[in-house]
Amino acid sequence: MKTLLLTLVVVTIVFLDLGYTMTCCNQQSSQPKTTTTCAESSCYKKTWRDHRGTITERGCGCPNVKPGVQINCCKTDECNN
């Protein structure tokens, strides 16, 4: 009986994902797609232009940006690709 109860608890934790974390893309500019697991509840994509052309930065959270930098924050997994 104890084994059955323990099995039910483990299955519940796995399926409910009690420690849910966000997955955000974190590749820079035109690099191949990579992701990271984040503790924050949002992802961002920052874009700006400099002497190299258009630069794109992706990551976790929703940072403040300087004037001239575009930012898009979102709240679903890999939404910042």
Swiss-Prot record:
Keywords: Acetylcholine receptor inhibiting toxin, Disulfide bond, Ion channel impairing toxin, Neurotoxin, Postsynaptic neurotoxin, Secreted, Signal, Toxin. Belongs to the three-finger toxin family. Short-chain subfamily. Type I alpha-neurotoxin sub-subfamily. Disulfide bonds join C24-C43, C38-C60, C62-C73, C74-C79. PROSITE patterns: SNAKE_TOXIN. It comes from the Eukaryota. This is Short neurotoxin 1. Residues 1-21 form the signal peptide. One of its GO terms (cellular component) is extracellular region. It is found in: Secreted. Pfam families: Toxin_cobra-type (PF21947). InterPro entries: Snake_3FTx, Snake_toxin-like_sf, Snake_toxin_con_site, Toxin_cobra-type. Expressed by the venom gland. Binds to muscle nicotinic acetylcholine receptor (nAChR) and inhibit acetylcholine from binding to the receptor, thereby impairing neuromuscular transmission. It comes from Notechis scutatus scutatus. GO terms for molecular function: acetylcholine receptor inhibitor activity; ion channel regulator activity; toxin activity.
